[in-house]
Swiss-Prot record:
Belongs to the UPF0637 family. This is UPF0637 protein llmg_1936. Transmembrane segments: none annotated. Gene3D superfamilies: Protein of unknown function DUF1054 (3.30.930.20).
Length: 199
């Protein structure tokens, strides 16, 4: 599980130095939790094969990443081309999202479906959304409808929906509780995900 050291990594200066710590400290946690999320998904959607990916940030040449993430998708060679699940970390929180980022192939179809879905009624009120995977800012669930509409109208718009866990909770005392909440987050998002995969 993540620890306070996981969050401190984002204070390290320099691309190489920060990436070295991300690889040694954060990515093994992604793998550990990711396998549990993968097992959960595979049990719930048994007729679909899922693949686990870890962001490598290979295109970066100068700036160290301000966040990092892993993803679960139905594609072996990537994840951004479709709606997918993300487990990631910023300097002050960990998140799990159902993500539509970087102009997925069915962006307009996703937007149309989500605009007509009463998402606020399908999820508990502690869910939040992100409109840009490169920014730490999040918005309440009440902002979902507007963001879903924007996804259909603005080519470069993004939409992620899920939960976050503030870094203060990662003191080693709540690890099993946090993991249970993560699995439950996937479970709550599954009906939405399944509808997205049908479009």
């Amino acid at each position: 599980m993540f620890t306070q050291k996981s969050f401190e990594i984002f204070s390290i200066d320099g691309l190489e130095a920060r990436m070295a710590e991300i690889r040694s400290e954060i990515q093994p946690v992604f793998s550990e939790i990711g396998q549990k999320l993968l097992t959960e998904l595979s049990a719930k959607i048994s007729n679909q094969e899922f693949y686990f990916h870890i962001a490598q940030h290979r295109r970066r040449t100068a700036n160290a990443p301000e966040n990092t993430w892993s993803a679960i998708s139905t594609k072996a060679r990537g994840y951004k081309m479709e709606a997918h699940f993300q487990l990631g970390i910023w300097e002050d929180y960990v998140f799990i999202y159902l993500s539509m980022i970087d102009q997925p192939k069915k962006q307009k179809e996703y937007a149309e479906l989500l605009t007509n879905l009463s998402v606020e009624k399908m999820l508990t009120e502690d869910f939040i959304i992100s409109k840009d995977h490169t920014k730490a800012e999040v918005f309440p669930l009440s902002a979902f409808s507007e963001a879903a509409e924007r996804l259909g109208k603005v080519k470069k718009s993004e939409l992620e929906i899920g939960r976050l866990w503030p870094k203060e909770r990662f003191d080693g005392k709540e690890d099993s509780k946090i993991l249970a909440e993560m699995l439950e987050t996937i479970d709550q998002l599954l009906p939405i995900y399944q509808k997205l995969m049908e479009v």
